[in-house]
Amino acid sequence: MSHYIKGSDKLVCKSPAIYVSSQVFYNKDLYDKAAKQIKFIKKSLKFYKTILSLPKGITFRLGSVKGSVNGYYVGKSKVLGLDVKLVDYSLVLSHELIHASQFYTKKLNVKQGTFYWNGSKVGRKGTTFNSYRNQPWEVEAYDGQADLTRKVIEAMMSSNVDF
């Protein structure tokens, strides 16, 4: 188990592996939001895989995410975290799956804390939102997340998937 999955997290689905923070089970609102996210992940993942090159064995974690972050993807351990409080989780899921694809296709790589984009070393991100947002992998993820979400939802609707 990755250190991004906590010992108190509960495995609620084996395929795909979805863990939920234990805090969710003590709050009805969070529980209801997590249930919707789980359903969407389970039903949408096969559609994402038709559009993106994704690694096998992505582990999902639903729980609190610190700071102003809505989600994250850790390339080496293939853990995708989503903030369980999100309303627009499909957009964040698309954003993080774009990162998963970037790592899987080696477009984005990290070696000893140094980021490489398409094989070229990229300087450290700055401390502002703009410097973070202007990193090439973030530009691609932000620019593509809405279109990817639309394509996946359209594919699900045309396949009569209830979500």
Residue ranges and their predicted role:
Residues 29-54:
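Zn2+-dependent metallopeptidase catalytic core
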Residues 59-90, 100-104:
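Active-site scaffold of zinc-dependent metalloenzymes
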Residues 2, 51-64:
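Predominantly extracellular/secreted Zn2+-dependent metalloproteases
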Residues 1-17:
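N-terminal low-structure segments adjacent to metalloprotease catalytic domains
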Residues 95, 99:
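Histidine-centered divalent metal-coordination motifs
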Residues 127-163:
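Long, well-structured alpha-helical subdomains associated
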Residues 87, 91, 103-138:
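Post-HEXXH active-site segment of zinc metalloproteases
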Residues 13-28:
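Acidic/histidine-rich, surface-exposed loop or edge segments in extracytoplasmic proteins
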